[in-house]
Regions:
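A charged N-terminal "starter" segment
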Residues: 1-129
Length: 129
């Protein structure tokens, strides 16, 4: 049984993950001091690393493609990004760069969809759930 918070995080998330490191006792992300960012912008602090979004989408698609082949699945598979995960336009647009469709969760999302369509980021072929 793990008794400290550090041990819990270590066993649950395999921390530190790629990109994170300790530098002179301070947590960094790709060489950037997180303490510096927290002191500058305050907390709570949310960090979004756009290249990771594409990596995770590719990983999920790969898992599904392997399962589809292994099970001789004849249906179609479409990866859908759930907008409630993050409504920030730069995050949704990054996801759309990886040939995804969108899952909406509220009436607020309809405005997002309209803006994305006006910007040419989605079209009539984009599946909206």
């Amino acid at each position: 049984m793990k008794n400290t918070y550090f041990q819990l995080i270590n066993q649950t998330y395999y921390f530190p993950q790629e990109g994170f490191d300790l530098n002179q006792g301070s947590l960094t992300f790709h060489g950037i001091s997180l303490m510096y960012l927290i002191e500058k912008y305050g907390t709570p602090f949310r960090l979004t690393y756009l290249p990771r979004i594409g990596d995770q989408i590719k990983k999920a698609k790969n898992f599904f493609n392997k399962a589809i082949k292994a099970n001789n699945y004849k249906g179609e598979y479409h990866y859908c990004y759930c907008t409630k995960c993050c409504h920030f336009s730069h995050v949704i647009e990054e996801a759309l760069e990886h040939t995804v469709h969108l899952e909406t969760s509220s009436s607020f999302d309809i405005d997002i969809i309209r803006i994305l369509e006006a910007k040419g980021k989605i079209n009539k072929k984009t599946i909206l759930i």
